[in-house]
Every structure is written in C-alpha cells, then in structure tokens.
Regions:
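Short glycine-rich substrate-engagement loop in P-loop NTPases that contacts/grips substrate
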Residues: 3, 28, 32-68
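Walker A/P-loop nucleotide-binding motif
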Residues: 3-20
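Loop/turn-to-beta-strand initiation segments
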Residues: 32-33, 68-71, 100-106
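Histidine- and/or cysteine-centered catalytic micro-motif in compact active-site loops
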Residues: 7, 11, 39-42, 77
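Short, basic, helix/turn surface patches
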Residues: 61-70, 130-138
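P-loop NTPase Walker A phosphate-binding motif
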Residues: 18-30
Length: 146
C-alpha cells in the first residue's frame, strides 16, 4: 500500500486498538521507533511543550519525538476535549508527519462526517487523501469475554 498511514474507524470494542498494537509490535520487532498515545495524552504533551516555557526541555523532546518517530499511534481520537488548540495541534501533527513521510495510525469511534465536523475540512481532507481508511465492524468483544 502506497499510503503509509491508517485510520481505523468503528464502534467501541471492535478491535481498533488491538490491531494498532499488533502493527506496533511487528514494527518494534523490526527496530522501528513507535510511539503509542491516547489522543488526550498526545495533546497534553503538545500543550506542555507549548505552554511550559522555554525551560522544559523534556516536554519539547517528547513533542519532537511525536513528529519524528517512525510510527505514531493516536488512539481514541475524539475522546479528548476539543478546542481551537486541539484542532490546530492535530492539523500540525498530521501535516508535519506527512511532510516528513512518517507513518501514523489513528483510531477513532467517529465517522468521517463526524471527524470533519469535529475538527476541520483541512484535517479530514488530508486523512481522506493520504490515509488508508479501514472501517471495522462488529459487536464489542469486551462484553463477549465477560
């Protein structure tokens, strides 16, 4: 597949995170750098690097690694509190990683329409054109295990 990034969509418990982690495990086994973050954690890191002042080198390093790692996994996009900062940082992250030719996996419960409405046309346009969109279907497997 020429598209190096993936968007997994689907209901809760249909295997989006599991598949993301399977891909991560294989890439780590092949010595690629992989960062897994929930969307909330990623935006917290980006906010820390932006607003903690110039003295927080660790926060800046963590934010830089989000952009530079071979594979970034953003889990549960759409569960974070959305605001202008979040939307701008999501655009920056997606766009910058595309420019650097770095792969990203995003998992979300949001449909493409909801994704566009929640964030922006600029973000959804890049995802639609540059990501393999893989919808997952099925019941919540967590409730079947219990």
């Amino acid at each position: 597949n020429e598209k190096g990034s993936i968007l997994f969509t689907g209901n809760t418990g249909c295997g989006k995170t599991f598949l993301s982690n399977c891909i991560a495990r294989e890439l780590i086994r092949r010595y690629y750098s992989v960062v897994y973050l929930t969307a909330t954690d990623m935006f917290d890191i980006l906010a820390g690097s932006r607003f903690n002042g110039n003295d927080d080198d660790e926060a800046k390093d963590r934010a830089a690694y989000i952009l530079d790692c071979d594979l970034l996994i953003i889990d549960d996009l759409g569960t974070e509190l959305n605001n202008t900062f979040v939307s701008s940082q999501l655009f920056y992250c997606i766009n910058e990683r595309l420019l650097r030719k770095k792969s990203t996996i995003i998992s979300t419960n949001l449909s493409m329409t909801m994704l566009r409405d929640t964030y922006s046309d600029r973000i959804s346009s890049r995802i639609i054109s540059q990501y393999s969109i893989i919808p997952l279907y099925g019941d919540d497997i967590r409730t079947k295990i219990v």
